[in-house]
Amino acid sequence: TWSDVSPKDKLEILLLDTLTNTVATVAESNSWNVQQGCMAQWLGPEFKEKIIYNDFRNGHYCSVILNVFTGHEERIISVPIYTVATDGKTALTLDFSRLYRLRPGYGYYNVPEITATERIPDKTCIWRINLENGNVTPLLKYTDFANFEQRKDMVNAEHKVNHLMLSPNGKRFMVLHRWFEGRRKYTRLVTCNIDGTDMYNLSDDDMVSHCFWKSDDEILAFENKYNGGPGYYLMRDKTREYVHFWPGISGDGHPSYSLDGTL
């Protein structure tokens, strides 16, 4: 257990062999937090030799594609990753420095935030990454979210984005848009095409927490509904259709589905 939600210690990435019951250190990272580590994950489409993880090198955040069996770093990307497509070709990322100030357990401390004095920065907040050639493309700004189906409580609030997640087919992604008006926090769930077009305000009843794609057009979320209260709702993307699951459960959690969506 760590007392700091964004520790400054170096993190070791371990590979556990369940057949031989051995443990090996395959990499280290200087950018991590207690909620999501350094985003270390197996890289598709094979998910058996390569991992990708975030690090801080030469004064900059980056992400590293590593073959865990040869130890060869196959590519160093100039930005960190947040969510990765299952085909291993595309990723999305956000501003980890602003996230660190507004939610330290999810951000990284290494690089000072350049938007700290701006409540609604006219600056990029989501980027698209080509993992095959390293190209990084700006997608959306904070102002894009603040001006999209704007509510009165957004106008003088401080804005951030978090919890990016690509759909299983990699064509759309979801993101939590959050804003703070005094001590009050508001959250809505927005979905969008992978190129930043066709934004859709899927859930805007003040609170959305943990979410998961069940399929390419269905999302399960713990959220609030004005006519149903907090709970788990399965929503169909780009529609107003939803089903309230397990009405007797009102506590927040981390929902997930099996690969085929049956469990």
Model-derived segments and spans:
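Blade-terminus and WD-like Trp-Asp/Gly-His loop motifs, strongest in beta-propeller folds
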Residues: T1, G37-I51, Y82-T90, H163-R172, ...
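Short consensus segments that form the blades of beta-propeller domains
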Residues: W2-P7, F56, I114-I120, D153-V155, ...
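Structural motif
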Residues: S6-L14, G59-I65, R101-R103, D122-W127, ...
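Catalytic phosphate/metal-binding cores of nucleic-acid and nucleotide-processing enzymes, i.e., regions
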Residues: D9-K10, T25, Y200, E223
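Multi-bladed beta-propeller domains
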Residues: L15-Q36, N67-P80, E132-H159, T191-V208, ...
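Asp-box/WD-like beta-propeller blade repeats and closely related beta-sheet repeat scaffolds
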Residues: E28-C125, L139-D153
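Beta-propeller domains
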Residues: D153-G231
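Loop/turn-rich, solvent-exposed surfaces of beta-rich toroidal or solenoidal domains
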Residues: G228-P230, W246-L263
